[in-house]
Amino acid sequence: MKIGIEAQRIFRKNKHGMDYVVLQEIKELQQMDTTNEYYVFVKPGEDRCVESTKNVHVIELNCPTYPLWEQWALPHAAKKYGVDILHCTSNTAPIWCNIPLVLTLHDIIFLEPRDKQNHSLYQNMGWFYRRLDVPRILDKCRRIITVSNFEMENIISKLNIPRERMAMIYNGYNDWFKPLDDKNDIYKRYIPEEGYFFFLGNTDPKKNTERTLVAYSKYLKLSDVKRKLLMADLDKEYLDGIIERNQIDNIRENIVMPGYIVNNDLPYIYNKAFAFLYTSLRESFGIPLLEAMACGTPVITSNTSSMPEIAGEDAILVNPESSDEITEMMLRLEKDQDFYEQQKQIGLERAKLFSWRKTAEKLLKLYQEVYSEIYQQ
């Protein structure tokens, strides 16, 4: 069986969620499957995070734009190398492609009503491209994979896809996310002192950055400790806008924004955090939830979409539209030591249910099922 895997962006330096998912899937398949042939199609970049092996061939395709790479370069290369199945891993796929397709559709947020907040040019272009592409490829996909039961039911309901063509495969997390020796000081590259709140906010409205910062402002007014807030992926201009709109100038001197945090440093960041805030309005899965829990860091997360499914019913679940609820749980973790220790243990046990090996095993089984349906009838 020859399997093509679209992994366009995994060689870029600053990777994001979907990039890490396909990268870990490839690495696990590379270790566990020496029988089938894999052709991994990527765009050239500075981070060569996976190399070719005997049966895994990394093919670099140079093309100026994402749509052109996916719609023209990818199907031509897949045909050239004679793949039996082409797995497109990041929500979209080539419209004109005669090779049987498997699609990972992480979410359908792009089909849901948009809020009135400003979006970046990159976000707008991605939104329009997905809205154009996805409706045109769904009927051509032999299987559509998604990453949580919440998202699967959402996709089936809104896109009217037969259940038998859907597959739910949970993501995993890397095994270096674990409790670490207290002596490490790598966190100091980003923030001077440990015991901070950690938040991966950005400009995407679904990340709920503005409301979370309002909650943090309320926390600072009520707390005797006044812990710092470490935030990644947010620039000063965007922060200034939030502060001015909400009149929360008291947060300025307590927020640390180092910019992009290298993935290899994240285990140290989680370990030295007092708690992790994952208060999104909407997520299809939430790998950072698992990473924090696996490090023994208490998590405050939302009671919406997939987050209760991933974090578990015993996790700290709040209404993400209520800054008061977020503040309340920040303070409770700080004041109630028994509750704090209980949440650490709950997270450690919950994280054990997920792994990239389990993800890859289910993915390989799906490839085999699709191949049998097509070629062994």
Stretches with model-predicted labels:
Residues 1-377:
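Carbohydrate transferase catalytic cores enriched for Leloir-type hexosyltransferases
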